Design a protein with these regions (language model features):
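Pyridoxal 5′-phosphate
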Residues: 1-179
Length: 181
């Protein structure tokens, strides 16, 4: 079988699966427990966190684990909105977002945030000229998906980030996954 629906679910890399199984077998304890098995599980999580932090060039304390992408998107968007609410309530996104993003933005809109959707060009990418027009001093967030799950279009994330440099309170949320970091 040739599996092509990677946007819905991606088969786990064999090395990752082997490592997961090895850790599950050797560290079955609850990392929050004070017994030996819990301490071993905590040490394994701490080691993995250190490795991820090094790969991303961040501090381990900046790594937050969630149950999945939907929870992560929800958490990130709401956290940014609440963090920057004193600087503005304007958010820009695209009509192509996953429901975990669009649904969270709808909830924020119901709480008084203003949501604008940037136009998409015929090739499926963000219209950077329209994005530039939508940006305002009170824009606190631009949310885009790196690769559209239906069209497969890669968004110009680097160019979008460059547009935000003049907006110090505007964060860029990119829904994406990292492979082989």
């Amino acid at each position: 079988m040739i599996y092509l629906d990677y946007s819905a679910n991606t088969p786990v890399d064999e090395a990752v699966l082997e490592r997961f199984c090895a850790v599950e077998r050797s560290c079955p304890g609850n990392a929050n427990s004070r017994h030996q098995a819990g301490a071993a599980a905590k040490a394994a999580i701490d080691e993995a966190t250190q490795s991820i932090a090094r790969s991303l060039n961040v501090q381990p304390a900046e790594i937050i684990y969630t149950s999945g992408a939907s929870e992560a998107n929800n958490f990130a968007l709401k956290s940014i909105a609440r963090l920057e609410r004193h600087h503005g309530k304007h958010i820009i996104s695209t009509p192509l977002e996953h429901s975990s993003v669009s649904g969270t933005l709808t909830a924020l809109q119901e709480q008084g945030y203003e949501i604008d959707l940037v136009d998409i060009k015929q090739d499926g990418t963000v219209d950077l000229a329209h994005l530039r027009e939508l940006l305002r001093p009170d824009t606190i967030l631009v949310a885009v998906t790196a690769v559209d799950s239906e069209l497969g279009m890669v968004q110009p994330v680097t160019e979008i980030a460059a547009l935000l440099k003049d907006y110090p309170h505007c964060h860029l949320h990119v829904d994406l996954s990292l492979i082989h970091i």
